[in-house]
Regions:
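Polytopic transmembrane helical bundles with strong interfacial aromatic enrichment
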Residues: 1-130
Length: 130
């Protein structure tokens, strides 16, 4: 199977998101455990967890698009998963590392985008007639 340019880009993004989730997880476990409070470490870990979960979701959406390249709803879901993940996880990383509580107000935007993305993804899968 020949991957189109968009598929290659999103597969590379997925691989980089997974690599960075592993790196952030290790950084949190080893580099931040003596710096952050237990509560802030838990918040940081939540960002890592959701980055892992949504990286798998992004991979799934990308594979589905490779199988159904003309399904625009899949592409919308894929993009929302990526944007939602970046907003959600990065806001938690910065909130904890830089001690910027204001970023806590941004985190739910990322979470909401993730929820919308997976609802669209489910709809796209169920309504696919190709």
């Amino acid at each position: 199977m020949i991957f189109d340019r968009r598929a290659r880009i999103f597969l590379a993004i997925t691989a980089l998101l997974m690599a960075s989730a592993i790196a952030f997880g290790a950084f949190g476990a080893h580099g931040l455990k003596n710096i952050l409070t237990a509560e802030m470490l838990k918040v940081f870990h939540t960002g890592v967890e959701y980055q892992f979960y949504n990286t798998f979701g992004l991979f799934m959406a990308t594979v589905l698009i490779m199988l159904r390249p003309y399904n625009k709803k899949l592409k919308v879901a894929q993009l929302l998963i990526l944007i939602g993940t970046l907003i959600f996880s990065i806001s938690l990383y910065l909130l904890t590392i830089l001690n910027l509580p204001i970023l806590g107000a941004i985190t739910p935007i990322g979470g909401t985008l993730q929820i919308i993305a997976y609802v669209i993804l489910a709809y796209a899968i169920l309504k696919d007639n190709q």
